[in-house]
Swiss-Prot record:
<feature type="region of interest" description="Disordered">
    <location>
        <begin position="402"/>
        <end position="421"/>
    </location>
</feature>
<dbReference type="InterPro" id="IPR011989">
    <property type="entry name" value="ARM-like"/>
</dbReference>
<feature type="region of interest" description="Disordered">
    <location>
        <begin position="426"/>
        <end position="450"/>
    </location>
</feature>
<feature type="region of interest" description="Disordered">
    <location>
        <begin position="54"/>
        <end position="74"/>
    </location>
</feature>
<dbReference type="GO" id="GO:0008017">
    <property type="term" value="F:microtubule binding"/>
</dbReference>
<feature type="region of interest" description="Disordered">
    <location>
        <begin position="332"/>
        <end position="351"/>
    </location>
</feature>
<dbReference type="Pfam" id="PF12348">
    <property type="entry name" value="CLASP_N"/>
</dbReference>
<dbReference type="GO" id="GO:0051494">
    <property type="term" value="P:negative regulation of cytoskeleton organization"/>
</dbReference>
<dbReference type="InterPro" id="IPR016024">
    <property type="entry name" value="ARM-type_fold"/>
</dbReference>
<comment type="similarity">
    <text>Belongs to the Crescerin family.</text>
</comment>
<dbReference type="InterPro" id="IPR024395">
    <property type="entry name" value="CLASP_N_dom"/>
</dbReference>
<feature type="region of interest" description="Disordered">
    <location>
        <begin position="131"/>
        <end position="214"/>
    </location>
</feature>
<dbReference type="GO" id="GO:0015630">
    <property type="term" value="C:microtubule cytoskeleton"/>
</dbReference>
<dbReference type="InterPro" id="IPR034085">
    <property type="entry name" value="TOG"/>
</dbReference>
<protein>
    <recommendedName>
        <fullName>TOG array regulator of axonemal microtubules protein 2</fullName>
    </recommendedName>
</protein>
<dbReference type="GO" id="GO:1902904">
    <property type="term" value="P:negative regulation of supramolecular fiber organization"/>
</dbReference>
Length: 1002
């Protein structure tokens, strides 16, 4: 039984700085401190000087009580393992079993040599401080303070390092929140529960005040001025974190650990090892990992009972493994992170979408959810499965199918890891983008092109292709059938009208969808307020947002399909609005309007459709509108029939025939085809002859009838070429749904030609004109098939502001005309206007080139077409252009009259009457400039030669002034002298003799 006089010495660790906060995970490794950061004297003493000298306490004092004393004063709990920041960051907790530093080899022999005797334990202080070269006086004072018999007890020990150096090395930042202590192993948990003290070993401390004083005095070296430490180290020093005390449940060596150098009968309190110091410098985070000297017993201990042997501490042999283990573990973890990042970046496609695109995607998904909630969804899905890939793509485009890959960005399988589980912020960031669709890397569909964007058209089908139009129409019908009904349709109608009256385009879109649902499921409810609904929907056709406009057009088509003849009263206003949208440049708007007009023609009363189309589209200035009108009007005539049309009132029949003749003579090739087709339908009926007898047919009607009888087969070819032109305008689609090589090449050539002709630099425009001339010589069929598209861009170059481009375009046109010949007819009028305007140019080169163009027309094109075009243009010309065109009319009269006398009488005689009526006595036209008497005399003489006395008969019906002027011109003696020379130039008949003779032979 021990008494209070029996003094048992115990080793107590000196207080150290406790870091109570989180430590950033930075790279771990031994790095040199910055120059001048640490006193040079410290390097000589090595870093073992960082470990303070411990004081002596009686062995009777209980370690647990000492632990509580330390906890009260420095918040440091001994005998209980602390939770290191390694465990907080996913590192293994049992760090004591990892490899140790390189100082262990020097510490083990020293400990083995001194462990045989209790008295020699005091020499361990020298072994520990052997690199410091302690003075003999300091060693003597240390032995005196540690003598258990003599000398004062409880004398506070002072550090062997100078105060300034200690303060510089052990500077700590402001205290941070404490770190909770958690046992690192199950054995430590059990040891903590048992207080880790042997039974009977707990004794009260003899002088707790003295020990507290020692601890307090020793702590003064840890709290020093921040300025001094900052100056010495040049950065932030993160204080050491106390290591958890390892369990001592067994004395046997575990695998991977070194055996304890102490005897089993020795009970030693091990002091903490050298701190792990980090330096944060200006260039970046650097870490200094000093060499960790082996922990040694600080004071000799008295031999205890052999029963206490299993609890011998292994902290000295285990805690020194920590730094090496942490460094290697951090490197392995970082390499794993890099591998995972590389694997993730190689298997995932990062998608960046703008905010506007995200909003569009969100709205499209809302529409999908609205359309997908329907009663017969499984049946509809089975129907879609049976259809082809193109139909599914079309349905997905219109919002009837969910986007492929919509939802959260999927993470590849096998990518889960402990690091990924700890990255909560990154996962939340990815989760916030769940509304965006993932775009997978498609490697299994080489036969189809990717979509250009979320809202782009499928690359398989081209704009304007019949396949695309048919699938859009099928999609509209399917969507109409699958719309779900309202539980309260009256309330739904009211809500739809309110939405259409809103200023928000999204609300308008919702209202249009509700109208479609009402039309599909509650058509009787719409009938009560059909006029209001029709006006509201028609008003949205002209919406500036194309999405709303197209949806409104589709809604009108649905109303026509469902309500049929109930829409008769609204047809005229709707047709006018839809035809106006046909002039829109957006092809998808044109297709939607065309389908809606087709639904109107098929479902309303044919008479209503006939009136609506003729009143709104026949006289429209846009050629696309007239073409669409002629197409649908032809379908209406086929429904009504020629007999019923000719059986109506005379005024209505005359108006109808007049409109059809106007369409048959339209400048657009397709419009002319449909117009002639309708006239041919009327001509095939027997009542048409009776109509001709009752009403005097106009010259236009006779001309159209003659053209149909002579070139009826050519009209079919005209339509085919027009349709072929539309297909070649985009891309030629092969049977497999992919564009052919020829179609792609043609499209690229036309695109490049258009770019050059519309360029800002005049050199590029001249290059474009030259390229067009090359195409006409090498590939005339290419230019002829795309004539309207090409010459719409080329014609402005005939009026180009740059004189070089203007002259070069006229000269090139003169070379193109003999190559293209009759295929140039659709653009003839615009070319004649451009050439005639250039005749008045002050630039001699431009005026000469314009005259050359007119000569090429006279030699290459049909004189009948030229006669009509020249006669219509001459009244609007001034200056030299009037003289030139009038002279050419004189030549055309001699060529055309033998074949088409009616054409001359209809077109040339009005021109002659105009000149004779407006011309003054000296031959000057007021406001036109120049003397035209000679040119008019030339024209009158040519008509007199061809018509003879009939010219006088036609003149008798004109005013007396015109008749006298004509007689004066014909009787003039100077007329023969002016036949050869007109204004110093050779007469046109002599110039054009070679070109007009073949025409005269006809």
């Amino acid at each position: 039984m021990d008494t209070r006089d029996d003094v048992t010495l115990a080793k107590v660790p000196a207080p150290v700085a406790v870091y109570c906060g989180s430590v950033p995970r930075t790279s771990v490794g031994l790095r040199a401190p910055p120059p001048g950061g640490i006193d040079s004297s410290l390097l000589a003493h090595d870093e073992a000087s960082l470990q303070p000298v411990s004081s002596v306490l009686p062995s009777s004092e209980k370690p647990s009580q000492l632990s509580r004393e330390h906890e009260d004063q420095s918040s440091l709990m001994l005998n209980a393992p602390l939770k290191g920041w390694q465990a907080r960051n996913g590192y293994p907790r049992g760090l004591g079993v990892l490899p140790l530093g390189h100082h262990l080899g020097a510490a083990i022999p020293s400990l083995e040599s001194e462990a045989s005797s209790v008295a020699r334990d005091t020499i361990q202080i020298k072994d520990k401080l052997k690199k410091r070269r302690l003075s003999e006086g300091m060693a003597a004072s240390s032995q005196a303070s540690l003598d258990p018999v003599g000398g004062p007890r409880g004398v506070p020990l002072r550090s062997t390092i100078p105060r300034t150096t200690s303060q510089r090395l052990l500077r700590v930042p402001r205290p941070m929140p404490p770190i909770q202590s958690i046992p690192t192993t199950p054995e430590a948990n059990s040891a903590k529960e048992k207080d880790l003290d042997p039974p009977g070993g707990r004794q009260d401390l003899q002088d707790p005040g003295a020990s507290a004083q020692e601890v307090q005095i020793s702590r003064q070296y840890l709290h020093c001025a921040d300025e001094k430490m900052h100056k010495s180290l040049g950065g932030l020093v993160i204080p050491p974190i106390p290591k958890a005390r390892m369990p001592t449940g067994t004395s046997s060596c575990r695998p991977g650990s070194l055996p304890s150098p102490l005897c089993p009968s020795q009970d030693v309190l091990m002091g903490p090892k050298a701190p792990h110091t980090r330096l944060t410098c200006e260039n970046g985070p650097l870490e200094k990992t000093p060499k960790s000297p082996a922990s040694k017993p600080l004071v000799p201990v008295v031999k205890a009972k052999s029963a206490e042997a299993p609890e011998t501490s292994l902290a000295s042999s285990q805690s020194t493994f920590t730094l090496t283990a942490f460094s290697s573990h951090a490197k392995e973890t970082r390499s794993l992170e890099n591998e995972e990042d590389q694997k993730e970046s190689s298997t995932k496609v990062q998608v960046t979408i703008s905010k506007s695109a995200q909003e569009k995607m969100r709205l499209k998904q809302m529409k999908e959810m609205e359309l997908l909630r329907r009663a017969k969804e499984p049946e509809w899905e089975r129907e879609l499965v049976s259809q082809g890939l193109g139909t599914r793509r079309t349905s997905a485009k219109e919002g009837l199918l969910p986007l492929r890959g919509s939802g959260a960005l999927s993470e590849p399988a096998g990518m889960s890891s402990p690091r990924r589980n700890n990255m909560g912020a990154l996962q939340r960031k990815r989760a916030n983008r769940a509304s965006l669709p993932s775009i997978p890397v498609s490697k299994q569909e080489p036969g189809f092109a990717r979509h250009a964007s979320a809202n782009s058209l499928p690359a398989v089908l081209t704009l304007g292709s019949p396949e695309w139009e048919e699938e859009e129409e099928e999609m509209d019908l399917r969507a109409l059938r699958e719309l779900r009904p309202f539980s309260n349709p009256e309330l739904g109608l009211t809500d739809a009208l309110q939405c259409l009256n809103s200023n928000d385009w999204q609300m308008k879109e919702k209202g249009l969808v509700n109208i479609q649902r009402l039309a599909a499921c509650h058509s009787e409810v719409l009938g009560t307020r059909l006029h209001d609904v029709s006006l509201a929907v028609t008003a949205e056709v002209t919406n500036l947002r194309s999405k709303v406009s197209r949806l409104a057009i589709s809604t009108l088509g649905d109303l026509f399909r469902v309500l049929k003849k109930n829409m008769d009263q609204e047809a005229e206003e709707i047709v006018r609005c839809l035809l106006q949208k046909m002039g829109n440049t957006s092809e998808f708007i044109q297709r939607a309007a065309n389908r809606a007009l087709g639904a109107m023609v098929e479902n309303v009363t044919p008479a209503r459709a006939l009136v609506a189309l003729t009143s709104a589209g026949v006289y429209h200035r846009n050629p696309l509108v007239r073409k669409c009108t002629a197409k649908h009007l032809s379908a209406v005539l086929e429904q009504i029939g020629a007999e019923k049309l000719l059986s109506g009132s005379r005024d209505n029949t005359d108006m109808l025939v007049h409109n059809l003749v106007r369409l048959a003579q339209d400048s657009n090739q397709d419009t002319r085809f449909y117009g002639r087709k309708m006239v041919n339908i009327l001509m095939a009926n027997a009542k048409f002859d009776a109509f001709l007898k009752q009403s005097l047919p106009s010259h236009d009607l006779r001309k159209v009838m003659a053209a149909i009888k002579q070139r009826g087969i050519q009209d079919n070819h005209e339509l085919q070429s027009a349709k072929g032109r539309k297909v070649s305008k985009s891309l030629v689609v092969c049977e497999n749904g992919l564009p052919s090589h020829e179609g792609v090449e043609t499209s690229e050539q036309l695109r490049e030609l258009t770019r050059l002709l519309e360029a800002k630099e005049f050199q590029a425009r001249m290059e474009g004109v030259g390229k067009l001339l090359e195409y006409c010589k090498a590939k005339p069929e290419l230019v002829a098939a795309n004539l309207v598209q090409v010459f719409d861009v080329f014609t402005p170059r005939l009026h180009d502001s740059n004189k070089k481009v203007n002259q070069w375009a006229l000269e090139s046109l003169a070379q193109m005309l003999p190559i293209l010949k009759e295929s140039i007819h659709p653009m003839l009028l615009s070319l004649i206007i451009a050439a005639a305007d250039n005749l008045n140019s002050k630039n001699s080169g431009i005026s000469t080139a314009a005259s050359t163009v007119l000569d090429a027309m006279m030699g290459s094109l049909d004189h009948l077409c030229l006669l009509q075009a020249f006669a219509g243009r001459v009244r609007f010309l001034t200056g030299p252009a009037v003289l030139d065109i009038t002279d050419r009319l004189s030549v055309l009269v001699a060529s055309v009259y033998p074949r088409k006398p009616q054409a001359v009488e209809r077109h040339i005689l009005p021109v002659l009457w105009y000149f004779l009526n407006k011309m003054s006595g000296n031959g000057v036209l007021p406001g036109r400039g120049g003397n035209v008497r000679t040119a008019v005399c030339r024209l009158a003489r040519s008509l007199q030669e061809q018509m003879g006395s009939r010219l006088q008969d036609f003149a008798a019906s004109q005013p007396q002034q015109v008749l006298k002027a004509l007689q004066g011109l014909l009787a003039s003696e100077s007329l023969g002298a002016n036949d050869k020379v007109i204004g110093g130039r050779m007469a046109p008949d002599i110039q054009m003799t070679g070109t007009t003779c073949p025409q005269q032979l006809d």
